[in-house]
From Swiss-Prot:
Tissue: Expressed in body fluid (at protein level).
Stated consequence of mutating residue 351 to A: Alterations in oligomer formation and in hemolytic activity. Alterations in oligomer formation and in hemolytic activity
Regulation of activity: Ca(2+) is required for hemolytic activity and the activity increases with increasing calcium concentration. Hemolytic activity is inhibited by N-acetylgalactosamine (GalNAc), lactose, lactulose, galactosamine, dextran with molecular masses greater than 4 kDa, to a lesser extent by inulin and only slightly by sucrose and melezitose, but not by glucose or mannose. The activity is abolished in the presence of 10 mM EDTA. Lactose-binding increases with increasing calcium concentration, but calcium has no effect on hemagglutinating activity.
Outcome (variant: residue 26 to A): Weak N-acetylgalactosamine binding
Outcome (variant: residue 351 to L): Increased antibacterial activity toward Gram-negative bacteria E.coli ATCC 43827 and P.aeruginosa ATCC 27853, and toward Gram-positive bacteria S.aureus IFO 12732 and B.subtilis IFO 3134 including increased permeability of the S.aureus cell membrane
Chain positions recorded as D-galactose binding sites: 19, 33-36, 49, 117, 131-134, 144-147, 178-181, 191-194, 219-222, 232-235, 266-269, 279-282, 286
Protein name per the record: Galactose/N-acetylgalactosamine-binding lectin CEL-III
Effect on the protein of changing residue 381 to A: Alterations in hemolytic activity compared to the wild-type protein. No effect on lactose binding
Highest classification ranks of the organism: Eukaryota, Metazoa, Echinodermata, Eleutherozoa, Echinozoa
Gene that produces this protein: cel3
Documented effect of changing residue 381 to K: Almost no hemolytic activity
Length: 442
């Protein structure tokens, strides 16, 4: 079994997250959701909606939190009842009822061809599993005796690597794919290209095309992959997945084939203007689109020393800071998020897709504003008590190709080591020893 709890010390904010994303139930494929949208209260499964209360943080202190509010998953009682999103008890230490570990695993391949790994999530106080009330994997979430049933397995969903990010410009009209209205919800049509997030999309290995404004998927009205196209919550269904075969490309302009119907993304009429739907692939320019984006260099990740003590514990105030010569606009924030998700270099090697996805989510979350916190090294990642050593804060650097401007981001992500040599393990991985020279995936 893999432990979710490398350390038991309290974190006001989660400064060493192990994973961030949609936590889905293996049986129903629905998302773990905090009822309402404030991040507090009853926990149940729900259709995935892309909102922050469904962005779950698996924290290195053993707690499970959500991005909408810094609350902990807490069984109502002594670890034997319904689970709530409640204030974390931090002092004198986190109680075992708010700490969790991972149990048995089940690997499977989803509809997009991406391998997922679902695990049991076990409460330390009761030794019972996170469990969905309904045997179909829908309903309220509590804890129950571990029975190795599908509704007791959960996974942070991966879409695979991000392949493209930007606006989609039509070859015929030079107009861009646009979500009608200003909220990034509803019908999709062609419109003059502009720097609004409802025109920016991410394209993933599993075939999903996700709108940057609302985190929803390009979706065909008919479940058979035929009909009008809009954006809708991402359901892990083939009518929301698209391929981009080279046979349907003309230079940088390519057609998108719906995986359910094998029909092409098509603009109504023959001028490349108007509403968007699917139609038989005809090889005409109104069915071809080009990715238009601003380039950033591949980001690099390093650990910077923030304090050492060879005779005791290290305490430092940790802030989230961004250094950039220009304003970090909403457009720049999304570009950087996409750049991070496409790949990060640490110690001259590329980090895993899981690490880049989690870093991208951490970057996006940091844009809403954070407060400085005082953090103390009480334990090493290996769960041994911290007796001496150094604290390290993560730094991410990338350069905008067009302007040459450097952006440096120092998030509230830290590691504590015995050595005064920088940790050898990437963020969102675990140090297997006190000097952090050996690493394990979480």
């Amino acid at each position: 079994m893999v432990s979710l709890v490398p350390c038991g010390f309290a974190q006001v904010l989660c400064t060493n997250p192990l994973d961030i994303g949609e936590l889905r139930n293996y049986k129903s494929k629905q998302c773990v959701d905090i009822v309402g949208n404030q991040g507090s209260g009853n926990i149940a499964t729900h259709d995935c909606d892309g909102l922050s209360d469904q962005q779950i943080i698996m924290c290195g202190d053993g707690t499970i939190r959500n991005e909408a509010r810094n609350y902990c998953f807490t069984p109502d009682g002594s670890g034997n009842a319904n689970v709530m999103s409640s204030p974390c008890t931090l002092y004198p230490e986190i109680p075992s009822s708010q700490r969790w570990r991972l149990g048995r695993k089940k690997a499977f391949t989803d509809n997009g061809g991406i391998e997922q790994v679902a695990t049991e999530i076990i409460n330390l106080a009761s030794g019972k599993c996170l469990d969905v009330e309904g045997s179909d994997g829908t309903g309220d979430i509590g804890v129950y005796d571990c029975q190795n049933l599908d509704d007791q397995y959960f996974y942070i969903r991966s879409r695979g690597p991000e392949l493209f990010y930007g606006r989609l410009r039509n070859e015929k009209s030079d107009l861009c794919l646009d979500v009608e209205g200003s909220e990034g919800k509803g019908n999709v049509l062609m419109y003059s290209c502009e720097d609004n997030l409802d025109q920016w999309f991410r394209y993933y290995e599993n075939g999903e095309i996700v709108n940057a404004k609302q985190g929803m998927c390009l979706d065909v009205e008919g479940s058979d992959g035929s009909g009008n196209v809009g954006i809708y919550r991402c359901d892990d269904l083939r009518d929301q997945m698209w391929s981009r075969p080279n046979a349907y490309c003309n230079g940088d302009y390519c057609s998108f084939l719906n995986k359910e119907s094998n029909k092409c993304l098509d603009v109504s009429g023959d001028q490349g203007t108007g509403d968007v739907g699917t139609w038989q692939c005809d090889g005409l320019p109104d069915q071809r689109f080009k990715w238009v984006f601003d380039d950033w260099e591949v980001p690099t990740a390093t650990w910077n020393m923030v304090g050492c003590d060879q005779n005791g514990k290290v305490s430092q105030q940790i802030s989230n800071t961004i250094s950039f010569s220009s304003t970090v606009t909403a457009g720049v924030a999304v570009e950087v998020s996409s750049t991070i998700e496409k790949g990060v270099i640490f110690a001259k090697a590329s980090v895993s897709v899981k690490v880049t996805a989690s870093l991208s989510k951490a970057w996006t979350n940091s844009q809403s504003g954070t407060t400085a916190i005082t953090y103390t090294c009480d334990n090493y990642d290996s769960d041994e008590e911290f007796t001496r050593g150094c604290m390290w804060q993560l730094a991410i650097e990338t350069t905008e190709v067009k302007s040459g401007d450097l952006l440096v981001w120092n998030p509230q992500i830290i590691k504590c080591t015995r050595s005064n040599t920088a940790p050898g393990c990437a963020p969102f991985t675990k140090c297997a020893n006190e000097d952090c020279t050996f690493c394990t995936d979480i």
